[in-house]
From Swiss-Prot:
Keyword Transmembrane recorded: no
Family matches, as NCBIfam families: tRNA (guanosine(46)-N7)-methyltransferase TrmB
The protein's name in its UniProt record: tRNA (guanine-N(7)-)-methyltransferase
Record-linked SUPFAM superfamilies: S-adenosyl-L-methionine-dependent methyltransferases (SSF53335)
UniProt entry keywords in alphabetical sequence: Methyltransferase, S-adenosyl-L-methionine, Transferase, tRNA processing
Entries under InterPro entries matching the protein: SAM-dependent_MTases_sf, tRNA_(Gua-N-7)_MeTrfase_Trmb, tRNA_methyltr_TrmB_bact
Any GO CC annotation of this UniProt entry: tRNA methyltransferase complex
Function: Catalyzes the formation of N(7)-methylguanine at position 46 (m7G46) in tRNA.
Taxonomic placement: Bacteria, Bacillati, Actinomycetota, Actinomycetes, Mycobacteriales
Length: 255
């Protein structure tokens, strides 16, 4: 499936309307977003100035073209981790300096969130973070080759708490299969949620994907950084309501 007119009036803009959704040729469950539209937001003047200057270097928009990660980061052979739904990038910017040997790609729909992360990256002189604006499932499916990623992170995804909206949750059998395909053997999937019902939902799915071996939490021998370093905005709101943070780790089975 190709994306139609990809022209943009401004850097990093997405087409209006509903997000693009791939049709997968299997019987697994994938998020069906229905009436959800792209979130649009206004940047401050300073954010817009930085965006115009830095986006061509640091950012991309969802497209039907595989990313050449080595070329984008300017180095060969480094590990690559994709964070789905990076929000304002609080965890991203805190973790990246501690894993300087790893390429971090933050995927987010909300432009002001990416702009805030960009500000943290530029001010902190963090050189191992890049950004893609788009839906996480589509970005993974269209822009990363199978078996190319060392890690995938999904921190505090939208819980879609109403029963009729559960089908929109990103943690389902289909995405778990997609994550497994994109990970290298030995690659790690890390998920965190503070929503009790979503945690129960995930608990029912931890062994649904045969290519992912569930490691539980914590996993002391995990080959990647799992300490998120800071409390994100959404995590903080959950803690204020006495929510329990549930975390999950899987490793793609070795060949």
């Amino acid at each position: 499936m190709s994306i139609s007119d990809n022209s943009r009036d401004q850097l990093g803009e997405l087409p209006a309307g509903r997000p693009l959704q791939s049709d997968f040729d299997n019987d697994l469950d994938y998020p069906r977003l229905g009436s959800v539209t792209f979130r649009r937001g206004t940047l401050t003047e300073n954010q817009q100035t930085m965006w115009d200057e830095k986006w061509p270097e640091l950012g991309r928009v969802l497209e039907d073209e595989l990313i050449d990660v080595d070329a984008w980061f300017g180095r060969e052979g480094a590990k690559t981790i994709v964070e789905i739904g990076s929000g304002t990038g609080t965890s991203t910017a805190a973790m990246a300096p501690l894993e300087a040997d790893t390429n971090i790609v933050a995927v987010e729909l909300y432009k002001p969130g990416l702009a805030k992360l960009m500000g943290s990256v530029v001010r902190g002189e963090i050189d191992n973070v890049r950004m893609v604006r788009g839906d996480g499932i589509e970005v993974l499916n269209r822009m990363f080759a199978d078996g190319s990623l060392d890690g995938i992170r999904v921190y505090f995804p939208d819980p879609w708490p109403k029963a009729r909206h559960n089908k929109r949750r990103i943690i389902q059998s289909g995405p778990l299969n997609l994550f497994a395909k994109k990970l290298k053997p030995g690659g790690v999937l890390h998920v965190a949620t503070d929503h009790a019902d979503y945690a129960e939902w995930i608990n029912e799915l931890v062994e649904v994907e045969p290519l992912l071996e569930y490691k539980g939490w914590p996993w002391e021998e995990c080959p990647q950084l799992t300490d998120r370093q800071v409390i994100t905005k959404f995590e903080g709101k959950g803690l204020e309501k006495d929510h329990v943070i549930n975390e999950y780790l899987w490793q793609k089975v070795q060949n």
